[in-house]
Amino acid sequence: MFTDIDTQMNTSHALGSATTIRSKSLNLDKAIAQAQAQLHALQHPDGYWLFELEADCTIPAEYIMMMHYIGEIDPILQSKIAVYLRAKQSADGSYPLFHGGAGDLSCSVKVYYALKLAGDDIHAPHMSRLRHYILSQGGAAKANVFTRIALAIFEQLPWRGVPYIPVEIMLFPKWFPFHLDKVSYWSRTVMVPLFILCTLEAKAKNPQQISILELFVLHPDKEKHYFPERTLLNKFFLILDKIGRVTRPLIPKKMHQLAIKKAEQWIVERLNGEDGLGGIFPAMVNAYEALLLLGYDKNHSYVKTAKQAIDKLLVVKDHEAYCQPCLSPVWDTGLTALALQEVDKIGNREVLTRAYRWLKSKQLTNEPGDWQLTRPELAGGGWAFQFANPHYPDVDDTAVVAFAMAESNLPDLTDSIQLASQWIVGMQSKNGGYGAFDVDNTYYYLNEIPFADHGALLDPPTVDVSARCAMLMAKMAKQHPDYLPALHRTIDYIRSEQEDNGSW
C-alpha cells in the first residue's frame, strides 16, 4: 500500500515528466517555426530553392587542374580553392570521399597535384603527410582510371597506363557487347569527350611544367602493373585491350575521322547551354577540353558556353572557394515543399504555390532524351535534378516531386502528377526495381572492363530509388488501380534486397 509520501513523490515525478515533455515539445515547435521561417526567406522569387551541393575534394582539385590544362589561371580563385582543399585534409594526410571516411588514393593524388600546381611547397607539413599517405597506398600508379587519364594528359605517366578507349567505339552497333546505350547516363556523358581526349592524346599546357614524379613508387615509364587482374573475365578484357592497341594503326583514316565527328556531334547535341553536358562537372570539363582539342576557338559560342556552365558550379566566399559537382534546384525544391506542407499546408499555401508553379515549368514532357532508347513509346513526364538537363530526367527526382505534389492538395497539379506517375510506372526494370535514369541497365559484365575500376559504370535498380517510386505508386493506386501490378513488383524487389540484419 502506498503511503501519502509515496503518492506525493509519484505525483511530483509525473508532473516533472510532463513538464519535461512540454518543454521539449515547445523547443521542437520553436525549432520547426525557425526552420520554416528560414526556408521562406531562402526561397527564390521564381519559386525554387537551391542549396550548396558539397562533395569530396576531387572536383575542386580538378578545377585547378583544368585551369592549368588550358593555361589560363585565375590566381585569386586558385588561392581560394587551395585554402578550401587544405582545410579538408584528414589527420592521416589523406582525403576521403565523404566526411570522416577513410582516405581515398585517387582523390588524394588529384588534391596533391592541384596544391602543387597552386604553388604549395612539397616539403610543407600538409604536403608531406599527403605524399606519405599516397606512397603508402602504392603511389599514383595505383590510382583509378580517371586519375590516371588526367595524369597522362599532364604527361605524368605514359598513355599505356590508361585503358584503350578509342573514339571508334562511337561506331559500334547496338548489338555489340559494349555500346554507349549499355552504360549509365553519367558514364556516357563523361566517356564520349574522353574518347576524343584519349584518342588524340591530349596534352595539358601546364605552363609551369609542374611534375609529381615523387608520388610514384616506381618511375611511371617502368611501371608494368597499371591494370591488376581482378577476375578471369577482367583478364580477358585486358587481353582485348592489348590487341586493340596493337591493331590501332590498321583503323582506316576515314573511319577514324567519322568516329571523331560522331563523338563531336554527340557532345554538341547535348551541350545543354549554360547548364552543361549532363549537368555534371566531370562531363562538362571533359567536353570543354575536348572542344578545344578539336580546334574550336576559345571564343566560339560552344566553348564559351561550356566554360560558363562550369563556372556556375563555383561557390566563392571571402576566403575560400570550391566547385560543386552539379546544381540541385529540383531536388531541393521538391524536398523543401514536402517538408513545409507537412508543417502547415494552409499557412504555407502561397510559398508552396510558387514552388509548384516553378516545378511544373521544369517538367519534361516532349523533350528528346536518352531514356527513350529503351522506352520509345512511353510519354514523357519526368524531372531532371538540375535547372535544365532535358536529355536526362531522373526517376528519383520525379518520384519525390510528384509525391510532394500529390500530398499538397493544391489545384492545377493533377496533369503533372498523372504524367509523372505514368512515366514512373513505365520506367520499371524487369526485376521490379528502378534505376536512377535508365531501364534494365544491368550489363554487369561491363564492370570487368579496364575502364570500370571506379565502380560506377552502370545504373542498375537500387532500393532507395525503388522505395521512393513505391511511395508514389501507393499514393496514386487508389485512383489508378492499374498501377498496382507495378507497385507489387517493386515491393517484391525491395523485400528481396533486405540485408540479413534487417536493414536496406
Protein language model regions, located:
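Preference for long, amphipathic alpha-helical scaffolds in soluble/luminal domains
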Residues: 1-504
